[in-house]
Amino acid sequence: EPLRSPVARPTTRQQRKDRLAKAMTDVGLDPESANRFPHEFSGGQRQRIAIARALVTEPDVLLADEPVSALDVSVRAQVLNLLNDLVRERGLTMVFVSHDLGVVRHLCDTVVVMSSGRVIERGPLADVYGDPQHEVTQELLAAIPRIRVDGSTD
């Protein structure tokens, strides 16, 4: 579907097919499954399809809006690792939108914290996490579950 856009680069059916196969392979899916119905895929596979759809047009910037919030923990880790790999391998800039600052910590270099549609804090990850200036940022960071040495959580 994204390849049917007038701004998409491939012009022939074979070029579109090749681009789709590459995107599916890049996200860990078998290109032969391209004609399956959505209900035939797991939640993690559907998320990978969404990522492939975004990548198929070869963007410079990838907008990931809550890409793992509906996934279970093991699949979430796989998708986050995939996104991290894709950003590194393709030289992409990723705008990662999330309410989960625990996830943001592992994926982002720069953090922008918003509240009620306004930017309330921004900066390098180490600065925002190490010395949060805004009360909302402090509350969000305090809400990140932490594992204690004895294995229990806060």
Place the predicted regions along the sequence by residue.
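ABC-type ATPase nucleotide-binding domains, specifically the catalytic core motifs of the NBD
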Residues: E1-Q15, G123
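Hydrophobic anchor residue at the start of the ABC signature
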Residues: I51, V79
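Conserved ABC ATPase "signature" region
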Residues: Q14-E32, L141-A142
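Conserved ABC ATPase signature
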Residues: F37-F41, Q45
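A short, proline-enriched helix->beta-strand linker immediately N-terminal to the Walker B motif
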Residues: V56-D60
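A short, surface-exposed alpha-helical micro-motif characterized by mixed small hydrophobic
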Residues: V104-H106
